[in-house]
Amino acid sequence: MIVFPAIDLKGGEVVRLAEGDMDRATVYGDNPAAQAMLFAEAGAEHLHVVDLDGAFAGESRNREAVEAIVAEFPGYVQLGGGIRDATAVEGWFNLGVARIVIGSAALKDPDFVKEMAREWENGIVVAVDARDGMIATEGWAEVSDVPVADMARRFEDAGVASLLFTDIGRDGLLKGCNIDATVELARQTDMPVIASGGVKGLDDIHVLSLHAHEGIEGVITGRALYEGRLDLAAAIAMGARS
């Protein structure tokens, strides 16, 4: 199981939000590329980056920071946030991003996502971000009437690399990952699932790793790392054993 340390970008700074609320941002640094290298030094080979400004605006607002991260980080960068057209997808892949996460466009234009998945083999991840079990879009500001499982089924056999499941109500709060909902989603689909939202420590990593055989491909963690509650090297080692 892959452990993805997270770098969320707002105004060029490294931040974490509480429940996706841009007004509840905690700043953890002003040098995203340097933070990426700290994660690399701890053994990270995979990195999850989110352009928060882009998620709300629908276009990249932290391009310079993302470019610096991709240039410096020696591993695999997964990027999401406001990527909603083919030009943006192609641009990021050409820059060196390994995987693109698409959320809002996946709900509103699933054919676009399927087209991108065909064009960029193993390169597209669909974000299934949920508030109380319903898909949320536009930087989590809008909640739909589409259940998580229904959203996932739209992309069965479409060539999507993975599903990224986030329980918004836990994100950035250190309440613990919603393991039951994550595992249930993995059981309902043939696509690998990446867990996100609320990771508070090594126990979450351990329990998720026990379900790797059921399709849990990875887990994203941010605040627990920045606040010293989770040792990244230990988490990576635990994930590697699953």
Curated annotation (Swiss-Prot):
GO biological process, one term: L-tryptophan biosynthetic process
GO MF annotation list: 1-(5-phosphoribosyl)-5-[(5-phosphoribosylamino)methylideneamino]imidazole-4-carboxamide isomerase activity
Catalytic activity, reaction form: 1-(5-phospho-beta-D-ribosyl)-5-[(5-phospho-beta-D-ribosylamino)methylideneamino]imidazole-4-carboxamide = 5-[(5-phospho-1-deoxy-D-ribulos-1-ylimino)methylamino]-1-(5-phospho-beta-D-ribosyl)imidazole-4-carboxamide
Enzyme class: isomerase
Keywords tagged on the record: Amino-acid biosynthesis, Cytoplasm, Histidine biosynthesis, Isomerase
Active-site residue numbers: 8, 129
GO CC terms in record: cytoplasm
EC number annotated for this UniProt entry: 5.3.1.16
Pathway noted in the entry: Amino-acid biosynthesis; L-histidine biosynthesis; L-histidine from 5-phospho-alpha-D-ribose 1-diphosphate: step 4/9
One Pfam family named in its UniProt record: His_biosynth
Top-level taxon of origin: Bacteria
Localization, UniProt: Cytoplasm
Family: Belongs to the HisA/HisF family.
Full protein name: 1-(5-phosphoribosyl)-5-[(5-phosphoribosylamino)methylideneamino] imidazole-4-carboxamide isomerase
Organism expressing this protein natively: Erythrobacter litoralis (strain HTCC2594)
Gene: hisA
